[in-house]
Amino acid sequence: KIFLAGTIDNGDSEDWQTKICKLIEECTTNSKPIAVYNPRRDDWPEDDQTKLIEEQIKWELEHMEKADLILMNICGDSKSPITLLELGIHSKENKLIVFCPDNFYRFDNVKVTCERYGVPLISTKKIEDFVKDKILAE
């Protein structure tokens, strides 16, 4: 089970999660299914979001705990405050891999945190390439 944590920016950022879901779907077989938890929602309302926000937060926390692997993708042009919070929550677990370009405004925070807790940090490879080379190749 893989959780796709990272930049969403209220739906304004690149939809990298759907790309990863499609890539995994195209490359997996019925004999080796992979469950993917994608927190991005297409049905987010424009008006009152109060109830849905709480529901979404609880869903994400629950599914990050259930996941065997958390792929965290931080886009360089984003602030990603929730992603930074999630990095702090899950950095001591042995199931997190972080993708973050070195032009991210808080790259040093991400780098030092990952180093301290032994979290793999990939700043030179796109998440799509990693998924193809490391996850789907196994």
What are these regions (language model features)?
Residues 1-138:
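Conserved catalytic or regulatory cores that recognize and/or transform ribose-phosphate-containing ligands
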